[in-house]
Amino acid sequence: SGQTMNLEEKLKKQQYKEIWQQYCGFLDLSMDGYMKIQRRLMEEQIRLWSNCGLGQSILKGKHPKNLDEFRKMVPLTTYDDYADILLAKQPDMLPGNPVIWIQTTWEGGKHPIKVAPYTRSMLDTYRNNVTACLILSTSKEKGSFDVAATDKFLYALAPLPFATGLFPLALREEINIEFLPAVNDAVNMSFSERNKLGFKMAMQKDLGFF
């Protein structure tokens, strides 16, 4: 069905209107329409979060039903408030099943790193967002863009488990853009090695994105 086609397949079929609508259609929403969607999504998350161990570690038995109740019942938190559960990577305490754990450094924290769980639906949202960014970065006006599977992308990113490492993986599900150097090689290099080789390859092959 049309639903399961990815960006590359739609480009092959020259479905440019559908591509724009799917990934960039949100730009046509009014502020009210946009906020309505945001509120609905937020309330969905509140429901899931309130019913899991992580949420209840903050809520202590309370169950906010909407955004206003959530704001009244839930204090401002920092990573510190979630650290014990997240650092132990306890999936049964979370609102969804994590398929990957991302990490960042934790300056001044009680542990050298912070970890964050990503569920499949979070990765799907991330994939849609990076694809929209890719399209918009080549766009001069509404509906016009210039993306092709033959494009080259400089791999100047920190690899997994850092969040930027998700980028090539997410994009690969949509379009087989070539990274310079190739992702499998890049992840085993130091940052400077990766950049030096990437720029060298770009001079030989050309470069569409960085």
Predicted feature residues:
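Nucleotide 5′-phosphate-binding alpha/beta core
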Residues: 2-103, 107-210
